[in-house]
């Protein structure tokens, strides 16, 4: 019947809207992790910056020369590479792609920029976020 068709269409529209709202809520949560990281970095706080990463030995960081496994190893690499706030500079992100892959995974591609006293640096990154204990964290970071 015509009434049934309208009713079905109504539910399709409602469920579509719910999906979009849920996706944007997750995307906002993922972007908030990156913004918190940016602020921590710019405050010279690598420990707080690392809160955005999965605290696990299975965390994967893919750099230009090697793959590093583990949260602690990644933290130590950051601390060795950026010994002080002058070396850290000021970080900025330009998110180019943010895609929800499933209820548990989110994929982000962006450009990072470091403003340093000795000259600026920039590059691209891709991040795989996973929702663990109701919190989005980076489980794979590819920053060559």
What residue ranges belong to the model's regions?
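Bacterial Sec-dependent N-terminal signal peptides
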Residues: 1-26
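Short, low-complexity N-terminal intrinsically disordered segments enriched in polar/charged residues
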Residues: 17-52
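Hydrophobic pocket/interface hotspot
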Residues: 37, 49-50, 58-59, 74, ...
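A mature extracytoplasmic/lumenal domain signature
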Residues: 54, 65, 97, 110-112, ...
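Structural motif
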Residues: 55, 101-102, 132
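A short gly/proline-enriched turn/hairpin at secondary-structure junctions
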Residues: 58-69, 83-86
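Surface-exposed, charged secondary-structure patches
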Residues: 73-117
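Short beta-strand edge/turn micro-motifs at domain boundaries
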Residues: 122-144
């Amino acid at each position: 019947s015509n009434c049934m068709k309208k009713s079905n269409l109504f539910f399709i529209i409602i469920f579509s809207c719910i999906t979009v709202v849920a996706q944007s809520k997750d995307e906002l949560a993922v972007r908030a992790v990156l913004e918190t990281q940016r602020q921590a970095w710019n405050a010279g706080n690598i420990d707080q910056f690392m809160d955005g990463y999965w605290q696990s030995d299975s965390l994967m960081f893919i750099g230009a020369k090697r793959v590093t496994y583990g949260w602690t190893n990644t933290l130590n690499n950051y601390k060795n590479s950026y010994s002080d706030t002058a070396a850290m500079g000021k970080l900025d992100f330009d998110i180019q792609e943010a895609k929800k892959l499933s209820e548990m995974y989110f994929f982000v591609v962006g450009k990072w920029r470091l403003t340093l006293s000795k000259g600026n640096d920039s590059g691209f990154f891709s991040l795989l976020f996973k929702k663990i204990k109701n919190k989005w964290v980076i489980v794979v970071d590819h920053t060559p």
